[in-house]
Amino acid sequence: MDTLTSAPLLTSKFKPSFSPQQKPCFPHRRRFENGKKKQSIVPVARLFGPAIFEASKLKVLFLGIDENKHPGNLPRTYTLTHSDVTSKLTLAISQTINNSQLQGWYNRLQRDEVVAQWKKVKGKMSLHVHCHISGGHFLLDIFARLRYFIFCKELPVVLKAFVHGDGNLFNNYPELEESLVWVFFHSKILIREFNKVECWGPLKEASQPTSGTHSDLKLPQSCEEDCECCFPPLNLSPIPCSNEVINNTYEPIDGIGTQHGNL
């Protein structure tokens, strides 16, 4: 995934575009030597290039979970992190968030992790994906718009990583690719523009770069009392939907957590 804190702000409102024909956001600088223009070698951020999933760069960890167990019966959570040094992705598949992936100053600076949880609501499976846009330190707030853009651009790659890394699950239960994907963007109260929930449609479509949101759909609500049609129960959900990581664990705070406390 592209670096989420080191690129300039994009000031215009936009919807992510995946056309490889777009011009670079940051043109190369030019310098003059002996009266001639000479182009310097300056890295250009690949913000508008195609988002491509490379299976060879994905490392998958199964942590205390049955690879073949249906997520409607056993909690199943994905924790995906990215290394800007190696350009590799690490995907942990477990019953709860793998907090060890979120530790360290670098991860706290970047906050480019994506966590997701399978949920069954009123008998229907859906994948709830969580992205941290702003809150925690000032750089995240300054680059909130750019971070939202990058997350939207890279999410199809993330979803492909989930499907590829959890291949045995999808081979055994191919119907899961028909499940709706709900994306929760978490942003501090002062930047509410990016504190929202979007439906990206069925997983098999959401993992494609041309997928769009389905604004006509409403987020399904779990039953308030114990039932058999919803899973996991509210008190066992590993993702209480937070805007910030406190002590390396997700904690519910104001914002989306207040609006949708049953996530």
UniProtKB/Swiss-Prot annotation:
Q: Name one Pfam family in it.
A: Staygreen
Q: Where in the cell is it found?
A: Plastid, Chloroplast
Identify the InterPro entries for this entry. Staygreen
- Induction context: Up-regulated during dark-induced senescence.
> Can you list the GO cellular component terms from the UniProt entry?
chloroplast
Q: Which GO terms describe its biological process?
A: chlorophyll catabolic process
Assigned keywords, A-Z: Chloroplast, Plastid, Transit peptide
Q: Which residues form the organelle targeting sequence per the record? A: 1-54
- Record's keyword annotation contains Kinase: no
Q: Indicate yes or no for the key word Chloroplast.
A: yes
Could you tell me the superkingdom of the organism this chain comes from? Answer: Eukaryota
| Similarity remark | Belongs to the staygreen family.
Role summary? Non-functional protein probably interfering with the disassembling mechanism of the intact light-harvesting complex of photosystem II (LHCII) in the thylakoid membranes. Responsible for a stay-green phenotype.
Further remark: Corresponds to one of the seven genes studied by Gregor Mendel in 1866. The wild type line JI4 has a functional SGR protein (AC A7VLV1) lacking a two amino acids insertion. This protein is involved in the chlorophyll breakdown pathway.
Q: In its UniProt entry, what is this protein called?
A: Non-functional protein STAY-GREEN, chloroplastic
Lineage here is: Eukaryota, Viridiplantae, Streptophyta, Embryophyta, Tracheophyta
